[in-house]
Amino acid sequence: MFGTINTILTKIDDLVWGVPLIVMILATGIFLTIRLKGIQVRKLILAFKYMFSNETDGEHGEISSFGALCTALSATIGTGNIVGVATAIVAGGPGALFWMIVAATVGTATKYSECLLAIKYRTVADDGHIVGGPFYYIEKGMGENWKWLAKIFAVFGVLVGLLGIGTFSQINGITSAVNNFFDANNAWTVQLFGREYSWTVVIAGIILTIFVAFVIIGGLRRISAVAQVVVPFMAAAYIIAAVVILILNYKAIPGAVVEIIQSAFGMRAVAGGALGAMMLAMQKGIARGIFSNEAGIGSAPIAAAAVQTTEPVRQGLVSMLGTVIDTIIICTMTGLSIVITGSWDKGLEGVAVTTRAFQVGLPFPAKVSAFILMLCLVFFAFTTILGWDYYSERCLDYLTGNNQKVVRAYRWIYIACVFIGPYMTVSAVWTIADIVNGLMAIPNLIALLALNGVVVAETKKYFSKF
């Protein structure tokens, strides 16, 4: 039965992540990069300056620019950076990392554009909260006739929260890492749902479900507070560990880069399979890159809309750093660590691949390296679960007219999905996530292309002041 379900999911995944969507994602990023004259490079230093500034240029909003970036990073830096990169390289070869970086580079302009539009078209909800996101810039920017597209986006946003980035993949990644550390041989098992699971999976799942239930009741302000403390710490700890691996194995880096580039263009495949190998690397690299940095799927604009600013461009610059930090820095380090240690072709799956890279690459006993990775993954995934609860609730607010009874009921469903996640197979979890992520991106990319003139005009107007 599970085999049949996985086969069906894989076919749907191949359909969603076929050539049209890959071209659409890359083309949108390239088009916006050209229209904005490479703003992600030209204004990168200014973006970092704004990120570290505590100043706000207006009273509208609920959280600071740094708080919004941390909320967005808390939702983007998750299992995608550790497990997603590993699954992409295992499935698509080392070349998947190349396409992940390419998509992120042009996707930075996409992230800038969507967060700029979120500020420009945000509104005040009936309960007094500042709200915004793709559903509002589709409706207000493209016109009432496009409200159906906004609703489609919101529906897929809820599904991504429940079935994609928000719950299954994160909790599954956490419990897999915990199990890999405490009971790798599954010595202590229990029979559940017709299958055997380690007690570590069950216990970790229950504990994390309780923590999630506690935090999401606090709403955005508590999520933002948690994110601002946890995200910088967990990102720094993970980056330091990855840098140590790269420094200790620096002689292997040139060979790894060559292998990544050759794999990206199918150079190692036989002549007839070169194109297929290249397409597989593109598909897995871009899909898992989108999973990780969320550029183009429309999630970050929901957090950006709550920022205390009246300048859409300013927040667009800060928000685009999420893609730089998440993929161009963290995912690249993960991918290089996996390739230079050779852990990707050892027949391992999911978190075990990155764990193997840390065990081989770090100068510590295997248990210590596995523990470091487990801690990073727990923090990464936990904050992603919190961030996506907020995102999906805003989508639900839009669909239901801010019906709080529905939202409260949804929170229990969300918590239930967190509880279920540990008992799903790794392949099913990631395939489902890829499918709903791709479907969520389509209406947002359409809106970004339609409203590119607004983005360019706002950008020119802002920088004309300097």
Please identify what each model-predicted range represents.
Residues M1-T79, I89-A96, G107, F419, ...:
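N-terminal alpha-helical transmembrane segments of multi-pass membrane transport
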Residues T4-I5, L36-Q40, G80-V85, G161-I174, ...:
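Transmembrane helix-loop junctions in multi-pass membrane proteins
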Residues M24-F31, L36-F48, I171-V178, W199-N249, ...:
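Membrane-interface loop-to-helix entry segments
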Residues T28, L32-T33, S74, A103-G128, ...:
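Helix-loop-helix module between adjacent transmembrane segments
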Residues T33, E114-R122, D126, A241-E259, ...:
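Extracellular/periplasmic helix-exit of transmembrane alpha-helices
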Residues G38-S65, T87-I89, G93-L97, A109-N145, ...:
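Flexible loop linkers connecting adjacent transmembrane helices
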Residues D57-E62, P94-V102, K140-I152, N186-G194, ...:
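Membrane-interface alpha-helices at helix entry/exit sites of multi-pass transporters
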Residues G58-A91, L117-G141, I152-V155, L159, ...:
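Alpha-helical membrane segments and immediately flanking helix-loop junctions
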